[in-house]
A protein has these predicted regions:
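Short alpha-helical segments that sit at the start of domains
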Residues: 1-21
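Pre-recognition alpha-helix immediately N-terminal to the DNA-recognition helix
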Residues: 18-25, 82
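Short capping segments at the starts of secondary-structure elements
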Residues: 29-33
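A short acidic, leucine-rich amphipathic alpha-helix
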Residues: 36-40
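Key DNA-contact positions within bacterial/archaeal DNA-binding proteins
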Residues: 46
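Short, hydrophobic-biased segments on the C-terminal half of alpha helices
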Residues: 52-56
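Glycine-centered, phosphate/nucleic-acid-interacting loop/turn motifs that mediate DNA/RNA or nucleotide
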Residues: 59
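Basic, amphipathic "hinge/linker" alpha-helix immediately C-terminal to the N-terminal HTH DNA-binding motif
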Residues: 68-87
């Protein structure tokens, strides 16, 4: 499958950060709260919020219930799903 230039740039953006890569893989095929993402990716929870904000800014993840303060649910966007399938 031929990847667009934009997708290659996004893939590079994710791959240069071990944290971003781990969070993307933790969200593959699942919806999770930040504490579960932290546990599954072996990253301390205080880093997860920053990584999720970065990935949201690039439209790779989305928060399903942004109106709640605790227990926010995150999942990959279509763009994020396409990208994570191409990360080794």
């Amino acid at each position: 499958m031929e990847l667009s230039d934009e997708m290659l740039k996004e893939m590079s953006y994710v791959k240069i950060s071990q944290y971003r890569t781990k969070v993307m893989k933790a969200l593959e095929d699942d919806i999770k709260i930040p504490s579960k993402i932290a546990k599954d990716s072996d990253i301390r929870q205080n880093h997860i919020s920053k990584v999720l904000a970065e990935l949201r800014a690039h439209e790779l993840v989305e928060c399903i219930n942004p109106e709640v303060r605790k227990g926010r649910l995150y999942r990959l966007t279509d763009k994020g799903n396409e990208l994570v399938k191409n990360i080794e």
